[in-house]
């Protein structure tokens, strides 16, 4: 889906993700697992952008799992112990060199670079 240009890949700091997850939990009664908190934060960003611009959009996000098995991450966030890692593009590129390329029909699955977004 990313390769087809149908979705964007962005980087969102952990604290923003967990803030969105707590708002979601308060409103929906579901504690999200840490993984979907990124999608929730992106949906919140999109909704706020629409609020500012006056644009009306349907915003869809996915929620997988629940956070009951990873409450330690929520505890770190609530106690102010969570940090946002701000890795440089060079550090990320170096780390990506050790990740094996998985190909489908001899074509790498990821051709376009992921983009970092500023907060």
Model-derived segments and their meaning:
Residues 1-30, 76-119:
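Active-site/ligand-binding loops adjacent to catalytic centers
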Residues 12-14, 34-36, 62-64:
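Fold-independent oxyanion-binding glycine-rich loops
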Residues 42-104:
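Catalytic phosphate/nucleotide-handling subdomain of diverse soluble enzymes
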């Amino acid at each position: 889906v990313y390769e087809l240009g149908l979705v964007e890949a962005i980087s969102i700091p952990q604290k923003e993700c967990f803030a969105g997850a707590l708002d979601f939990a308060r409103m929906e009664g579901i504690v999200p697992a840490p993984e979907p908190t990124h999608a929730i934060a992106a949906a919140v960003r999109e909704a706020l952008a629409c609020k500012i611009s006056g644009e009306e959009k349907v915003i869809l996000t996915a929620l997988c799992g629940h956070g009951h098995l990873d409450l330690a991450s929520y505890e770190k966030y609530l106690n102010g112990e969570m940090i946002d890692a701000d890795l440089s593009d060079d550090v990320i590129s170096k780390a990506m060199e050790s990740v094996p390329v998985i190909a489908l029909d001899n074509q790498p699955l990821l051709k376009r670079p992921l983009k970092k977004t500023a907060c």
